[in-house]
Amino acid sequence: MIQVQSRMKVADNTGAKELMCIKVLGGSWRKYANIGDVVVASVKNATPGGVVKKGDVVKCVIVRSKKGVRRPDGSYIRFDENAAVIIKDDKNPRGTRIFGPVARELREKNFMKIVSLAPEVL
């Protein structure tokens, strides 16, 4: 469950290391985002020479969340950290690699490129 001011790790190779959520997209009163939701975030920590710099405002999709997501069969999937992938406006990732596992819910929300680049889909 990501809300405004939540900090997340970055699960791609754009050069950003840490993001802070600025806005949850999808409605004016929406407070929380979960796996597969798009948020606007600020880059808080970045490596030198990367695609994005510290202070950049980017769109990203949540790929891992500490808050469990309920599956249709009744099971829950949760991760040890909150992580996001920086995306372009056409839902494609800005980076060329994805690090760590991602949830299967991304496939249902049409983030196919992220799912195909991920080393593991849980």
Swiss-Prot record:
Keywords: Ribonucleoprotein, Ribosomal protein, RNA-binding, rRNA-binding. The keyword Membrane does not apply. SMART domains: Ribosomal_L14. SUPFAM superfamilies: Ribosomal protein L14. The keyword RNA-binding applies. Pfam families: Ribosomal_L14. CDD domains: Ribosomal_uL14. One of its GO terms (cellular component) is cytosolic large ribosomal subunit. Transmembrane segments: none annotated. One of its GO terms (biological process) is translation. Signal peptide: none annotated. One of its GO terms (molecular function) is large ribosomal subunit rRNA binding. Part of the 50S ribosomal subunit. Forms a cluster with proteins L3 and L19. In the 70S ribosome, L14 and L19 interact and together make contacts with the 16S rRNA in bridges B5 and B8. Binds to 23S rRNA. Forms part of two intersubunit bridges in the 70S ribosome. Belongs to the universal ribosomal protein uL14 family. PANTHER family: 50S/60S RIBOSOMAL PROTEIN L14/L23, LARGE RIBOSOMAL SUBUNIT PROTEIN UL14M. This is Large ribosomal subunit protein uL14. The gene is rplN.
